[in-house]
Amino acid sequence: MARTTPIARYRNIGISAHIDAGKTTTTERILFYTGVNHKIGEVHDGAATMDWMEQEQERGITITSAATTAFWSGMAKQYEPHRINIIDTPGHVDFTIEVERSMRVLDGAVMVYCAVGGVQPQSETVWRQANKYKVPRIAFVNKMDRVGANFLKVVNQIKTRLGANPVPLQLAIGAEEHFTGVVDLVKMKAINWNDADQGVTFEYEDIPADMVELANEWHQNLIESAAEASEELMEKYLGGEELTEAEIKGALRQRVLNNEIILVTCGSAFKNKGVQAMLDAVIDYLPSPVDVPAINGILDDGKDTPAERHASDDEPFSALAFKIATDPFVGNLTFFRVYSGVVNSGDTVLNSVKAARERFGRIVQMHANKREEIKEVRAGDIAAAIGLKDVTTGDTLCDPDAPIILERMEFPEPVISIAVEPKTKADQEKMGLALGRLAKEDPSFRVWTDEESNQTIIAGMGELHLDIIVDRMKREFNVEANVGKPQVAYRETIRQKVTDVEGKHAKQSGGRGQYGHVVIDMYPLEPGSNPKGYEFINDIKGGVIPGEYIPAVDKGIQEQLKAGPLAGYPVVDMGIRLHFGSYHDVDSSELAFKLAASIAFKEGFKKAKPVLLEPIMKVEVETPEENTGDVIGDLSRRRGMLKGQESEVTGVKIHAEVPLSEMFGYATQLRSLTKGRASYTMEFLKYDEAPSNVAQAVIEARGK
């Protein structure tokens, strides 16, 4: 089969936003205008197409990143058809991992902001992730019809809170119930959409007289931003020459692709205004797969030789599995992005991360939860494979004759855990299967068995994250489970360097003995300086310990790091320098050196000022003004550090840093303090030393 859409006419985009910015409604409108949906699904009646898991429809929030394909030829049918693959990303902070995962496979993103709420805390998190993956983006300021809507205020927040360089592409005509359309600052025309056909048709009109001055000012700003793309354009602009529409658009596109500016559009998805022009901006300004740098990876040659793959059908096949989902009808769905080459149904490919072959059976393209079966997928496209056996999120799928491992994704460590127990014997077996499958889908979710209590422990990024896991076990796998109290994921570390700590394991009574002897230094590492949180330096001189025993010393210490001497929590941010020791020709063994290392570790840890670290959360509360004092007082009682507050249209926004252990049940307390009028968001910020009384209580509770 030949390619139906040239790769330059592809757009792989994410739509990202804070939880209530109206992202799902925006996506629905995109599907409506691109002709996919004939009836618009509204989130508030639980019918939105993209939100296809039952919990999402009940809670009105988006959990799973669904990928959908749509076609767009422009508001005035001014383009050849472009293929837009939309990855819907969740806006709730517990699902940040989903956003991170989507960012990895996108080429561009649309950031949706609420015209009233502006740049919210989750918007900042998503922004940082988009920066990390260098994703070019445009912004859509939604909900211009709401009370308190202010387009230019949000533009200013994009600048001050995100440190970005926003350039309005449009201005809003009116606001709140008087919002009627937008001014196109490139064409210098007003756009009015037709209410009778839900905004499918529109008219260009003259700019309202009372807006001409403002429009001229922002048009000038837009032209200046375009002129900065090249010296040639700047000379033309400074010489007083007019830039053509094609020059303006080309220059703005170049600057968006270089991540130098953020073009800002506006509208009200709910009122069918603005989404159409935002789609035009996606085509005009966001990259196709050939506009972004080639993907990096390493060759599977034992030497980790760097390599890259370009977005071309002629290169060997390479793809990244970015999401595993369980579909009630077909089982496992593996969403993958093809970076190079072509794959056909029936092909055998290599999972280079696991060194295992997989056969592509059926391939489908998703429209939210409907699916269309296809025979091939080409470079730049996104699809889902049914029934791959052993693929995990982040694995590379590639041509067995040209193996490559694409850059892996990094997933954060969970900060909260709970014990789950099946209610009946029948639930026991099903629970293992269910949790295994859910862990495969979501790398930020972990499952293990506690060795002491023999309980099954599940861990994730927040209370809501784990609630939904338990809920899915019940709905999708019919597993009834009792859930324990949430537990905080503490860590242990040291604050002081200790030198010449000795560890000796010697057993030499008759027969073959055991002998290992090590001398180490232990020292604290700067938090975050080493991704593993641990380093091991071998400084043995003159063979006092033979080379073959060195890995055993490292291993002995690493085993101790899993459960620290203080309270049995993982040890982080410490380094070990092995610099002396001794061995015995006959009696030394790997086991003896492993045991000697663990003895030295325990001995040194006690002397190195051990401390307990607790997770600190970044908390933002929005509350009516009259409740500010109560909310701040309550956060202080929870050992919260107040970081500032600001006035909003809807009340006061309070910024604080609070230990996770103090935040359980906060939603209920906040509701009663403010009669349900306040809301909050919380995300993991850092680990910090727990005060001694808190540490003492935790250590005693662990029975250490």
Swiss-Prot record:
GO terms for molecular function: GTP binding; GTPase activity; guanosine tetraphosphate binding; translation elongation factor activity. Residues 8-290 form the tr-type G domain. CDD domains: EF-G (cd01886), EFG_III (cd16262), EFG_mtEFG1_IV (cd01434), EFG_mtEFG_C (cd03713), EFG_mtEFG_II (cd04088). Gene3D superfamilies: 3.30.230.10, 3.30.70.240, Elongation Factor G (Translational Gtpase), domain 3, P-loop containing nucleotide triphosphate hydrolases, Translation factors. Keywords: Acetylation, Cytoplasm, Elongation factor, GTP-binding, Nucleotide-binding, Protein biosynthesis. GTP binds at residues 17-24, 88-92, 142-145. SMART domains: EFG_C, EFG_IV. It comes from the Bacteria. It is found in: Cytoplasm. One of its GO terms (biological process) is ribosome disassembly. SUPFAM superfamilies: EF-G C-terminal domain-like, P-loop containing nucleoside triphosphate hydrolases, Ribosomal protein S5 domain 2-like, Translation proteins. InterPro entries: EFG_II (IPR041095), EFG_III (IPR009022), EFG_III/V (IPR035647), EFG_IV (IPR047872), EFG_V (IPR035649), EFG_V-like (IPR000640), EFTu-like_2 (IPR004161), G_TR_CS (IPR031157). PANTHER family: RIBOSOME-RELEASING FACTOR 2, MITOCHONDRIAL, TRANSLATION ELONGATION FACTOR G-RELATED. Belongs to the TRAFAC class translation factor GTPase superfamily. Classic translation factor GTPase family. EF-G/EF-2 subfamily. HAMAP family: EF_G_EF_2_B. Catalyzes the GTP-dependent ribosomal translocation step during translation elongation. During this step, the ribosome changes from the pre-translocational (PRE) to the post-translocational (POST) state as the newly formed A-site-bound peptidyl-tRNA and P-site-bound deacylated tRNA move to the P and E sites, respectively. Catalyzes the coordinated movement of the two tRNA molecules, the mRNA and conformational changes in the ribosome. This is Elongation factor G. It comes from Shigella flexneri. The lineage of its organism: Bacteria, Pseudomonadati, Pseudomonadota, Gammaproteobacteria, Enterobacterales.
